[in-house]
Regions:
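Short, conserved catalytic/metal-binding motifs centered on acidic residues
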Residues: 1-3, 7, 44-55, 89, ...
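Active-site-proximal, Lys/Arg-enriched surface segment
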Residues: 8-95
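Short, glycine/charged-enriched secondary-structure capping and boundary segments
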Residues: 62-65, 154-158, 178-179
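Domain-level cores of phosphate- or acyl-group-handling catalytic modules
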Residues: 113-174
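An anionic, glycine-rich sequence signature occurring as long contiguous blocks
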Residues: 162-217
């Protein structure tokens, strides 16, 4: 193996699109090999996790693409933090192997934008690119309550994907009401001790179809 400085120098010469293309070839090779087919859930769907993470934080603006957060101190003065985030789509291959399927940076177009970029908008861009790169891949999107928005769920339905999303009682009142409605009718399902994992979970299906209400974000 070459020295890590040599590897870093080589990678710096490559465009992000080139690296993304290489990742795609590696993922398609893994899927074609059928080595990890047992990782698929019912119906042959591959689980893909959506999750955003922070990369860098600054006290001053780093570049025109910085996101910013305004904090109010105890003395009522304002403090502005600047930061960079990225959204990752991770493909689950088994209980111990998760690989990157796609990457989307969450960033402002310039410092004068009136509305900042966010994880949901980044998710829309990332999901569109995943569909283009893997048009026939059967996918089940996994995510926290942030992605349980009608716009994200509609993308999944249009792509004939499945999705498993958490709910948030505070911000998603309609979904929470539908969820409790199904539970009250005893149409809930339980999963106990899945493979090597020990525990118990409760879930219901088709929450968005029960009362006809939709969460709009």
């Amino acid at each position: 193996m070459p020295h890590y400085d040599t590897r870093n120098y080589y990678l710096e010469q490559l465009s992000p699109n080139c690296l993304d293309e290489l990742r795609g070839k590696m993922i398609r090779s893994l899927i074609r090999s059928k080595t990890f087919n047992e990782a698929r859930i019912a119906g042959g769907y591959w689980r893909i996790i959506l999750d955003g993470t922070g990369l860098f934080h600054f006290k001053e603006r780093h570049c025109e693409n910085c996101l910013k957060a305004v904090h109010i101190n105890e003395d009522k003065s304002k403090r502005i933090d600047y930061y960079h985030k990225v959204l990752e789509a991770k493909l689950i291959l088994n209980d111990k192997i998760i690989v990157s399927l796609g990457t989307e940076f969450i960033e402002n177009e310039n410092e004068d934008v009136t509305k900042q970029d966010c994880e949901q908008n980044a998710a829309k861009r990332l999901l569109a690119r995943i569909k283009k790169q893997y048009p026939r891949l059967k996918i089940c999107i996994l995510g926290d309550a942030l992605y349980a928005a009608e716009s994200i769920m509609q993308i999944c339905r249009n792509n004939e994907w499945k999705y498993i999303l958490n709910k948030n009682d505070g911000n998603q009142k309609n979904i929470s009401k539908d969820y409790e409605y199904i539970k009250a009718a005893e149409e809930k399902y339980y999963e106990v001790n899945y493979k090597l994992e020990k525990g118990k979970s409760c879930f219901v299906n088709h929450v968005e179809e029960v009362t006809g209400k939709k969460e709009i974000f």
